[in-house]
Amino acid sequence: MTTEKSLAAEAENSQHQQQKEEGEGATNSGQQETQLEEASQAAAAEGSDQGEQKLKASNGDTPTHEDLTKNKERTSESRGLSRLLSSFLKRPKSQVSEEEGREVESEKEKGEGGQKEIELGNSLDEDIILKAPIAAPEPELKTDPSLDLHSLSSIETQPAQEEHREDPDSETKEGEGIEECSGTEVKEDPESRAEREPEASQKPVRRHRNMHCKVSLLDDTVYECVVEKHAKGQDLLKRVCEHLNLLEEDYFGLALWDSATSKTWLDSAKEIKKQVRGVPWNFTFNVKFYPPDPAQLTEDITRYYLCLQLRQDIVAGRLPCSFATLALLGSYTIQSELGDYDPELHGMDYVSDFKLAPNQTKELEEKVMELHKSYRSMTPAQADLEFLENAKKLSMYGVDLHKAKDLEGVDIILGVCSSGLLVYKDKLRINRFPWPKVLKISYKRSSFFIKIRPGEQEHYESTIGFKLPSYRAAKKLWKVCVEHHTFFRLTSTDTIPKSKFLALGSKFRYSGRTQAQTRQASALIDRPAPHFERTASKRASRSLDGAAAAESTDRSPRPTSAPAIAQSQVTEGPGAPIKKTPKEAVKVEEKRGEEPAEPAEPEPTEAWKVEKTHTEVTVPTSNGDQTQKLAGKGEDLIRMRKKKRERLDGENIYIRHSNLMLEDLDKSQEEIKKHHASISELKKNFMESVPEPRPSEWDKRLSTHSPFRTLNINGQVPTGDGPPLVKTQTVTISDTANAVKSEIPTKDVPIVHTETKTITYEAAQTEDSNGDLDPGVLLTAQTITSETTSSTTTTQITKTVKGGISETRIEKRIVITGDADIDHDQVLVQAIKEAKEQHPDMSVTKVVVHQETEISEE
């Protein structure tokens, strides 16, 4: 049907053209010649257009196009048919582009001067376009780049044009009578379009392109992922934390390193592409906010990655340490990675495989090995916690440094940390601005300003300015200050204000969670502890508890008072008889190590206890000195220092002497007088060295449950955090009936039996002959006594210097006398808790519970 209609239309159109030509006569001969030229050009373009027609006709219109092309070839020599074909070839182009159609209409009106032909062409073209669309543009329009680019603007037309470029050479060979110039014209057209093809084809691809990211992790591995081009910083950070199985992700961030010492934090609220210069998206995963107290972190895996960050800081020189601190931190690193020392597995030079310091020496490695060999049954998680507890005390812990100059042009360094803004000059801190004193922080061009709150004697606010290298550096410092102040000082983040017309200033706000919100979220974590691999040994993080207590060469491993607490889990012995006058003493020894000269590990001191009291509990720690007091009712506790460590566990000597005072048996009277003469000096030195009390890991455990009811079969308390304790128990029953009868020969006086029970819990310590032979030089000593109606508390503080190391020891004794039953667990817990609150940086190494009960027989 379509073929018949198209042929009839062509016949009518040819007759119409012939009649019109005869009417016009010779006056239109010039126009006819022009139309002949156009017809010849159109016929030359037929060969190039046939390939496209065949491809498009493959959709179901093949018969129509084949008949039409055959008809064109048969009537190509006819003048009227040439004009008809010219109008047909021009008109479909106007259906594709309205602008081209208007140009074609204007040319046809000028060249032929008739409206009837155009109307007829429109009526015929509508059917032809629906059935067999013809896209054969004029030759002069093919070379117009603007029109070609316009035709490439849609994605749907792209495949047809690519197919059209493949066939023109083969199709031009089929056409006969085609001029050479028209053939070259057809060849140039695909080349010009091929040059413009990459530009047009890239547009839709870029619109949906994903970006490849590389993130260097703290364990020296690289995490690669693909993110959407418009992804924000928080999207990438979340993916990295999911890869690492981290839930406490607010302490971490992604950084871009401008240089080896300068980094820029990726803003989590902005798109990544707006913050990254260049195509390669390479980031590093780092700790952004260093927690002031790492013990408050909920999960071990979070503390482990914090340890990895601090190790990088130490090796890179961003966290300077002394030799002793490097050795101590290095030993905890080895313990965390390798576990307990095993000579068969580790050999003699295993520490050299680890990078522990910027300038690692053989001497440092030997010291690390010596300390590592002294640790027994310390879990990786406990070693990480000990590492963090020592690292957080360093002056440069968690300080983000920025180079600047003061108003006089002197080079300084500004440090931002959790407590405030620090100012350093020549590697020394010269000023500190805590966050509570800072009212406002701002920047203008390359200057950075802080407004300080006036003091008590000041009446006006003061503004301090600093000069930074560039505007970008000033803005970066300002952002870091805003983030640290918001995270550590505020309970919630501020909402970003709505944009106002011509609003001045930056809209930047910290968009993450604050530390308070992070702790609340961490408290809701109820998943089991995740298993992860240590970087060096690839050893799964697991508990190393259960190993027998062994000797330590240099110092007792102390998991921050956890051992002492977990160790003191026993108070009640077998069968409690009737108590008439129970007396209980709790004695807590604590030791503090200070490093005035060359720092080294404090050597543990051992104390012999020669006791005579009714019922006592003694808790010594691994580096304690002596504090002793008269136990009450004419009974004294005598403390002796052993020359050699050959004490029998649980051995106690009881002496009845009403006038015997507590003294060190190995010290002369002159030394004792010196002790009492320097009490004021000791008090001053001790109070200066004690920091603010802060809650420790043990205090948290005390608040949740009481661990004083369980014991292992071998008498060792199952502690998860501390070294094993050696428990000894001694029960002595003395018969005082004979003495009473000799003094008071009365039949009414009952016979009294005294039962004494002593339970000792002590951290495992090694034999150190040198330390015991050299008692050290005693600097100061102080004794403080307080009494109530039912208890007496005695605290003795001594300070000695041994081998260039200052050592402070505190011993506390509590004696409770009463007729009622006493909750020994509660007394012990309270004594240890008070000791830790008063001296949070000391450790409890020994607990001795001494109980004496008088049994009357009627």
UniProtKB/Swiss-Prot annotation:
Q: Where is the composition biased (Basic and acidic residues)?
A: 63-77, 103-119, 161-176, 185-200, 581-595, 606-615
Q: Which residues carry this modification: Phosphotyrosine?
A: 223, 654
Q: In what ranges is there compositional bias, type Low complexity?
A: 31-50, 78-89
GO aspect biological process, one term:
actin cytoskeleton organization
Residues with Phosphoserine modification: 14, 86-87, 97, 106, 123, 151, 153-154, 192, 522, 541, 543, 556, 658, 668, 678, 703, 706
Task: State the Gene3D superfamilies in the record.
Answer: 1.20.80.10, Phosphatidylinositol 3-kinase Catalytic Subunit, Chain A, domain 1, Pleckstrin-homology domain (PH domain)/Phosphotyrosine-binding domain (PTB)
Annotated localization: Nucleus; Cytoplasm, Cytoskeleton; Cytoplasm, Cell cortex
Compositional bias per record (Polar residues), positions renumbered to this chain:
616-629
Report residue spans for region: Disordered: 1-125, 155-208, 518-636
- GO MF assignments: actin binding; calmodulin binding; spectrin binding; structural molecule activity
Record region (C-terminal (CTD))? 710-858
Q: Which InterPro entries match?
A: Band_4.1_C, Band_41_domain, EPB4.1_FERM_F1, Ez/rad/moesin-like, FA, FERM/acyl-CoA-bd_prot_sf, FERM_2, FERM_central
Q: Cite the entry's keywords alphabetically.
A: Actin-binding, Calmodulin-binding, Cell cycle, Cell division, Cytoplasm, Cytoskeleton, Glycoprotein, Mitosis, Nucleus, Phosphoprotein, Transport
The protein's matches in SUPFAM superfamilies, at most eight in alphabetical order, are given as: PH domain-like, Second domain of FERM, Ubiquitin-like
The record describes its post-translational modification as:
O-glycosylated; contains N-acetylglucosamine side chains in the C-terminal domain.
Modified positions (Phosphothreonine) in chain numbering: 62, 379, 730, 853
What job does the chain carry out?
Answer: Protein 4.1 is a major structural element of the erythrocyte membrane skeleton. It plays a key role in regulating membrane physical properties of mechanical stability and deformability by stabilizing spectrin-actin interaction. Recruits DLG1 to membranes. Required for dynein-dynactin complex and NUMA1 recruitment at the mitotic cell cortex during anaphase.
Could you tell me what this protein is called?
Protein 4.1
Report the gene name: Epb41
